Amino acid sequence: MEKLNVAIADDNERMVDLLSTLVKGDKELELVGQAADGQEIYKIIKEKEPDVVLLDIIMPKMDGITVMEKVNEDPSVRKRPAFIIIS
């Protein structure tokens, strides 16, 4: 079975560490990126094309809602990830 690629975005470092540990501990998941702000995760989504993004709503530089809107509007994003909202 092919692994699901996962990216994480949260400005809370402890939350990112916790979620990263959980993802890395699951043999069916592959962590492809971590970000502390919306601009950074948007760049990761475009470059790494994750299957799933664990996304905080309230983040600096760009909030999670704006990230989702930009991804859905950007024709250069070939693979649309599933977003899971975290807080």
State the predicted function of each range.
Residues D10, D56:
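Active-site residues of response regulator receiver
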Residues D37-E40, D63-E69:
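Acidic catalytic/metal-coordinating carboxylates
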Residues K46-K48, N72-R80:
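Conserved phosphotransfer cores of two-component systems
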Residues K48-L54:
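Active-site beta3 strand of CheY-like receiver
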Residues M59:
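Receiver (REC) domain active-site loop signature in two-component systems and cognate sites
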